[in-house]
A protein has these predicted regions:
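An N-cap/entry alpha-helix motif that binds or orients negatively charged groups
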Residues: 13-56, 120-125
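Conserved, mostly hydrophobic/aromatic
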Residues: 26, 69, 91, 132, ...
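Glycine/Thr-rich beta-alpha phosphate-binding loop at enzyme active sites
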Residues: 35-49, 182-196, 235-290
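Short beta-strand/loop segments at the ligand-binding rim of alpha/beta enzyme cores
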Residues: 62-68, 141-149, 210-225, 286-296
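Catalytic cores of alpha/beta
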Residues: 78-83, 163, 225-239, 286, ...
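Glycine-rich phosphate-binding active-site loops on the catalytic face of alpha/beta enzymes
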Residues: 92-101, 180-182, 244-252, 306-333
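A gly/proline- and charged-residue-enriched helix-loop-helix capping module
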Residues: 94, 99-142
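C-terminal helical cap(s) of enzyme catalytic domains, especially alpha/beta-barrels
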Residues: 100-116, 256-269, 324-347
Length: 362
């Protein structure tokens, strides 16, 4: 009750009206309108919450806080500057493919209000690496920006696609993510298999050797993996010396959902995948002995849930669905709650809490 009251008080009247308007529209139209409003500067900012206890270093990068915006919200790097004003510790744009593509037929985005969830089957719709790289070249110098790498649906060589996008855009970003876990591009998840994954990551990592510009490379995996598959992924990650693993993408599973859209094809995100994605996170932390930085994603709406992800093994955590249901002020709310929760549990800073509760999820 207290959290709900705080959320209502912390949300401005304009944000309440804006959310009500957007949620009355078709989900994809609402999303596009939100991006346009951000670009035009007509979305009011919320006070940015800062605390020394939330600062940390991951993969050679210094983050003001561990809360990031997941890929998929700003697919084409159109609204980086206004998004940074909401207090995110980092933002990931994309996924971006070599050539522009329209993605899957509409409708392809569904709000599951009763479940506080979303199902999407976008299929890597984006403007292509050339247009996106030009936008990234004009990004603000402050803040940490990552790029989610994708492959074209009709590509004859998807492994080369990832490397091509990386080479084209890497000088403009602070990290890059190899996304082989989207369920909306046919056969993409097959690249998570040991042999294919090693070939892919070696190809992308080799681009680092050919250039003076080196940025951390992360791998984004699916939540629908068994322990043996996670062990293989951890082994390949260690062999190829990538800088981190993002766990997890959306799921193809359905968890006793209430919405009429529950049977729509696509990837499910939001509250229903919190436990599954957090368990995968904890398994990876255990398998890797905490030696590979992990970025948690899936179902985080509160500071307490962010804290649970961190205790399960995440150094950083990303959100998306929370913005759809709670607005941009949710970032400040979550960070304030995390700061207080750390203190209440006796942690001096966020780094002290990483992985301390991983065993509870195994």
């Amino acid at each position: 009750m207290g959290v709900i009251l705080y959320q209502r008080l912390s949300m401005s009247l304009s944000e309440k009206i804006g959310l009500r308007l957007l949620t009355s529209l078709d989900p994809e139209k609402a999303h596009n309108l939100a991006i346009r409003a951000l670009k035009l500067g007509i979305v009011s900012n919320t006070p940015v919450f800062k605390s020394k206890a939330l600062e940390l270093n991951v993969a050679g990068l210094k983050f003001n806080n561990p809360l990031g915006l997941a890929a998929g919200f700003d697919k084409n790097a159109e609204a980086i500057k206004p998004l940074m004003n909401f207090g995110f510790g980092f933002i990931e744009v994309g996924a971006v493919t070599p050539n522009a593509q329209k993605g899957n037929p509409k409708p392809r985005l569904f709000r599951l209000r009763e479940d506080k969830a979303i199902i999407n089957r976008f299929g890597f719709n984006n403007d292509g690496m050339i247009k996106v790289s030009k936008r990234l070249s004009r990004r603000p110098s402050n803040g940490i920006i990552g790029l989610n790498l994708g492959a074209n649906k009709t590509s004859a060589d998807r492994i080369s696609d990832f490397a091509t996008v990386f080479k084209t855009c890497k000088e403009f970003v602070d990290f890059a993510t190899v996304n082989v876990s989207s369920p909306n591009t046919e056969n993409l998840r097959e690249l998570q298999a040991h042999k294919e994954l090693r070939e892919l990551l070696n190809k992308v990592m080799s681009c680092q050797n050919d250039s003076k510009i080196k940025v951390p490379i992360f791998l984004k995996i699916a939540p629908d993996l068994k322990k043996g598959e996670l062990e293989n992924i951890a082994l390949v990650a260690s062999e190829t010396k990538i800088d981190g693993i993002i766990a997890t993408n959306t799921t193809t599973s359905r968890y006793n959902l209430k919405s009429i859209y529950q049977h729509e094809q696509g990837g499910l995100s939001g509250v229903p995948i919190f436990e599954t994605s957090t368990r995968v996170l904890a398994q990876l932390y255990s398998i890797t002995d905490g030696q590979i930085p992990l970025i948690g994603v899936g179902g985080v709406f509160t500071g307490e849930q962010l804290f649970q992800k961190i205790r399960a093994g995440a150094s950083l955590v990303q959100i998306y669905s929370a913005l759809i249901y709670s607005g941009f002020s949710v970032t400040t709310k979550i960070l304030k709650e995390l700061d207080l929760t750390l203190k209440n549990h006796g942690f001096k800073n966020v780094e002290e809490a990483i992985g301390t509760g991983a065993k509870e999820w195994l």
